[in-house]
């Protein structure tokens, strides 16, 4: 009888324990992709400091080379480095909680230093979510509405993971400039952190693959087809209209002499410019479907040139290719709208939509047609 009582009690305790375990909230996934951001290159020495005790590892053999104390300045010197690459990682805390100072600037995460052709390349080893804390507030103003910042967080996360080996030949994933995404390392904007945290692990996908979510400052009224900028057709990067048109107006003037000199002696002096008038969303032989300049004809005293809008933008450092241009007396005048290449999400447009109470997922679906929002981790 006593045995039966104990057996019953044991079974009851086991079942109760299982039930209680099932009732406990499951711990959120802490895993996230680690990114390699190229910070410095072509240097022979780099000054470093870490916020917590770390170990320096031979990146090839994985052997511990030495321990690094917290908050003590130290340097990695090319001449004294006996291996091709070292990594500095936290001894006890998660990588995301470490702050590394590289040449005076703070970054989330650890550090890798590679020997490359007589100099050092310095790389920030940073978890994706911490990387975004240093990107979102640089690519978009922290003064923008939360839903716009959340859209930016998803776009930046998707772009980073889609293009994470863009600089693989140089030994890292992404650079910290507009070539990839502007990254300033450690930043602590409350609203940016909220935007990142509330979209943790979310990316845009198209046909089960992460989308290449290009974005820009201001479309001027309508975004551009990626095929008209980089020559590749992408189903979700097509022109879409904004709530507002003719935004971010700009004017740039050049003397006719200066203008002509940019095309070489064989061009002579500019006599006339042939380009149809800009209308947002109206295509022409010399304009794309959004109204951006596809090409313009420049008539010189010695030669007539046909030049693309992209080349004109590059040659004269124009804010965008959404412009009119004319020869007026001894001046060439560009009058345009928008800032940036025009592909994908307009950051100013996202702000305007958010101010009209659009949620971040609705903003993203507007700019990236046919994509799906997916929680990757």
PLM regions with names:
Residues 2-377:
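Conserved, single-site charged/polar hotspot
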């Amino acid at each position: 009888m006593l045995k039966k009582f104990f057996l019953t009690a044991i079974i009851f305790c086991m079942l109760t324990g299982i039930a209680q375990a099932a009732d406990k909230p499951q711990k959120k996934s802490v895993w996230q992709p680690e990114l390699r951001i190229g910070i410095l290159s072509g240097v022979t020495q780099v000054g470093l400091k870490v916020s917590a005790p770390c170990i320096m590892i031979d990146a090839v053999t994985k052997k511990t080379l030495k321990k690094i104390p917290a908050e003590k300045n130290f340097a990695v010197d090319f001449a004294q480095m006996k291996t091709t690459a070292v990594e500095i990682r936290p001894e006890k805390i998660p990588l995301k909680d470490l702050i590394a100072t590289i040449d005076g600037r703070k970054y989330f995460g650890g550090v890798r230093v590679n020997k490359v052709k007589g100099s050092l390349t310095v790389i920030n080893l940073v978890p994706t979510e911490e990387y975004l804390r240093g990107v979102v507030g640089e690519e978009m103003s922290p003064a923008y509405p939360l839903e716009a910042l959340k859209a930016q967080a998803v776009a930046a996360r998707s772009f980073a993971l889609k293009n994470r080996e863009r600089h693989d030949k140089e030994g890292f994933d992404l650079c910290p400039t507009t070539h990839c995404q502007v990254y300033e390392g450690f930043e602590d904007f409350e609203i940016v952190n909220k935007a990142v945290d509330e979209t943790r692990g979310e990316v845009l996908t198209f046909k089960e693959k992460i989308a290449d979510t290009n974005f820009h400052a201001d479309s001027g009224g309508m975004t551009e087809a990626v095929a008209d900028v980089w020559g590749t057709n992408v189903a979700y990067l097509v022109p879409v209209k904004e709530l507002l048109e003719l935004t971010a107006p700009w004017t740039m003037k050049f003397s006719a002499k200066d203008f002509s000199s940019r095309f070489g002696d064989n061009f002579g002096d500019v006599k006339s410019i042939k380009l149809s008038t800009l209308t947002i969303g109206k295509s022409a032989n010399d304009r794309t479907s959004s109204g951006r300049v596809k090409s313009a004809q420049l008539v010189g005293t010695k030669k007539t040139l046909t030049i693309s809008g992209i080349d004109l933008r590059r040659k004269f450092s124009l804010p965008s290719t959404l412009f009119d241009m004319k020869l007026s007396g001894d001046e060439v005048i560009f009058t345009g709208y928008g800032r940036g290449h025009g592909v994908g999400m307009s950051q100013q447009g996202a702000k305007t939509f958010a101010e009209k109470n659009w949620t971040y997922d609705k903003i993203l679906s507007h700019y990236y047609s046919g994509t799906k929002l997916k929680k990757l981790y």
